Amino acid sequence: MAAPNDPELTRRRQRQEDFLRGTSKINFDDHVDHHVLSGKTAIITGGASGLGLGIAKALSDNGCRVAVLDLSECAEAGTDESNIESPKLFKCDVSSWESLLAAFQEVMLWSADRLDIVVLSAGVRSHNIKDLILKRAVGSASTPVKPPSSVFDVNLLGTYYSAYLALWYFTNLESKSDGLESSSWRPQLLFIGSLASYIEQPLSADYCASKHGVRGLWKSVRSHSASFGGCQTNLLAPTFIDNRQGSTKSRGDGALISLTTDVKLGEVADVVAGALRCICDNNIEG
């Protein structure tokens, strides 16, 4: 048992107190050095469209080798599956442990056993719990029908599986490290949450619950990131994002909203810039 004046115990207590108080505010005037991305390897789950695709392209443009893990082909041209320096698609279902593990193993072979960045952006749209109940209850048999679980399967379970594998590989690779990597670089684990990680979105019960869960998952590992290869963890929680063409726009999760609603929309570029700042600045952890 550690003594009351044990320096290590004091350090751990101080770190816990710091996280309870919250991390310091980000200075957005500070320069972001994108050069640190050169030669790094990144995995982006759900990187074939939307925010994930935007982050994947930005990392690739800055010299990072990017592996996109998704069920779909990339939504835009330019993803070259034969060029190791371009985003490469590895098809997988993040809600399946076996599929996700196989994809991570493929990426490690492709990257010559290197992994520096993992961005967890895979997600699916919500179901309206009122619609589910009313449509299935009116004129139906008296036995309730099981509600769909795909939102939990992808948004929460898939994120947990992906985070688990990222932390496992970060830890494993550190144990094999030759110590030549720059001491200022830390492996990066970036969770993509949502506005729904913090506030309610009426009737989007499965989506809100899953995104609150993502935030809880991130907070549960943040204070012990040094145990997992010394990694740095952050959470981005985008609001409604303008990431579609035409008369409708979407949230970060892709759920459509009407342009007639009085909602201020963010831009994909804003979220991408935030993601790169989190990944490139080792002073940000929150």
From Swiss-Prot:
Active-site residues are 207, 211
In terms of one coarse class, where is the protein primarily found? Answer: cytoplasm
Listed A to Z, the keywords are:
Cytoplasm, NADP, Oxidoreductase
The record's subcellular locations are:
Cytoplasm, Cytosol
Q: Example GO molecular function term?
A: oxidoreductase activity, acting on the CH-OH group of donors, NAD or NADP as acceptor
- Reply yes or no: does the keyword Oxidoreductase apply: yes
Q: Which family does it belong to?
A: Belongs to the short-chain dehydrogenases/reductases (SDR) family.
Pfam families membership: adh_short
Domain of life from the UniProt record: Eukaryota
Q: What pathway, per the record? A: Secondary metabolite biosynthesis
Q: What is this protein called?
A: NADP-dependent dehydrogenase clz5
- One GO CC term, this protein: cytosol
What InterPro entries does its record include? NAD(P)-bd_dom_sf, Sc_DH/Rdtase_CS, SDR_fam
Q: What is its EC number?
A: 1.1.1.-
| Binding residues annotated for NADP(+), in chain numbering | 49, 51, 93, 207, 211, 241, 245
What task does this protein carry out? NADP-dependent dehydrogenase; part of the gene cluster that mediates the biosynthesis of squalestatin S1 (SQS1, also known as zaragozic acid A), a heavily oxidized fungal polyketide that offers potent cholesterol lowering activity by targeting squalene synthase (SS). SQS1 is composed of a 2,8-dioxobicyclic[3.2.1]octane-3,4,5-tricarboxyclic acid core that is connected to two lipophilic polyketide arms.
What is known about its subunit structure?
Homodimer.
